[in-house]
Amino acid sequence: MPIELSTEIRPLEQKEFHRLDHRVMRMIFDIHNEFGRFLDESLFKQEVAARCLESELCPVQREIRVRVTHADFAKDYFLDFLIGSGFLLELKTAETLAPVHRSQVLNYLFLTGLHHATLVNLRPQRVQREFVSTGLTVEKRKHFNVTNARWCDNSDSATWLKQTVIALANDWGAFLEVSLYREAVTHLLGGQKRFVNEFRFCPATAV
């Protein structure tokens, strides 16, 4: 499978997701109040997992692996928490939540096929919580059109690059983080050293 999860995942309806979110966030607020905002991130996560188990929010899984493959390329992602097989929780200890954090969680939703996630930042004086949601399914992400009228097929390398990117999108779907597609292309070319200066591009006036 192009995208393989290390555990079974069950997408939640919005109502069920918010019900779990309410219970989990109550525990997170309690932990933040008891231990303060400078507790190490790994200890925060341990405490969240322990309290979820005490509250019978099962199963509680941590560091869930998602493996993305194409040909001999493979990349692993690890999700912070999966509670009740469908509640995705990502914890941060940053000065503030940033677009990169939201993009990361959205990427996880695309990879898992889930529709909702909770993103939490524990470092500020008051806990930051954001919902990240998408209506895009894997099927929708694989339904795309390629616009290549301005692409220059002026070499075998250029043709290979276009065909490879399209093959990756067919395998994984569109809208995953750009760095993933870039890493795959670089790997399939033989690595970073071989990739640099390998392609001949059209002059700027033709782009």
Question: Which residue stretches match the model-derived regions?
Answer:
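Active-site metal-binding core of divalent-cation-utilizing nuclease and nuclease-like domains
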Residues: 31-86, 125-137, 150, 154, ...
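Short secondary-structure transition/capping segments
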Residues: 107-115, 163-173
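Nucleic-acid nuclease catalytic cores
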Residues: 88, 92-139
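A generic secondary-structure micro-motif detector
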Residues: 18, 38, 94-95, 175
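Interdomain/boundary linker segments immediately adjacent to catalytic/signaling cores
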Residues: 1-35, 135-171
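Long, highly charged amphipathic alpha-helices
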Residues: 23-27, 47, 103-107, 184
